[in-house]
């Protein structure tokens, strides 16, 4: 994951550190 506080490019802003993150993370 990109790091705590970052999110995936998903409508729901899934946490990057979640195993559900499969989209490029945004800062």
From Swiss-Prot:
Gene Ontology molecular function: sodium channel regulator activity; toxin activity
Expression across tissues: Expressed by the venom duct, in the proximal part (indicative of a defensive role).
Stated name of the protein: Delta-conotoxin SuVIA
GO CC entries: extracellular region
Segments traversing the membrane: none
Family note: Belongs to the conotoxin O1 superfamily.
Residue pairs linked by disulfide bridges in the UniProt entry: 1-17, 8-21, 16-25
Keywords for this protein: Disulfide bond, Ion channel impairing toxin, Knottin, Neurotoxin, Secreted, Toxin, Voltage-gated sodium channel impairing toxin
Known function: This toxin activates voltage-gated sodium channels (Nav1.3/SCN3A (EC(50)=3.98 nM), Nav1.4/SCN4A (EC(50)=4.99 nM), Nav1.6/SCN8A (EC(50)=1.27 nM) and Nav1.7/SCN9A (EC(50)=2.42 nM)). It shifts the voltage-dependence of activation to more hyperpolarized potentials but has only little effect on channel inactivation. In vivo, it induces nocifensive or pain-like behaviors in mice when injected intraplantarly. This is coherent with the specific defensive role deduced from its proximal position in the venom gland.
Keyword Disulfide bond on entry: yes
Annotated compartments: Secreted
Taxonomic path: Eukaryota, Metazoa, Spiralia, Lophotrochozoa, Mollusca
Entry remark concerning the domains of this protein: The cysteine framework is VI/VII (C-C-CC-C-C). The presence of a 'disulfide through disulfide knot' structurally defines this protein as a knottin.
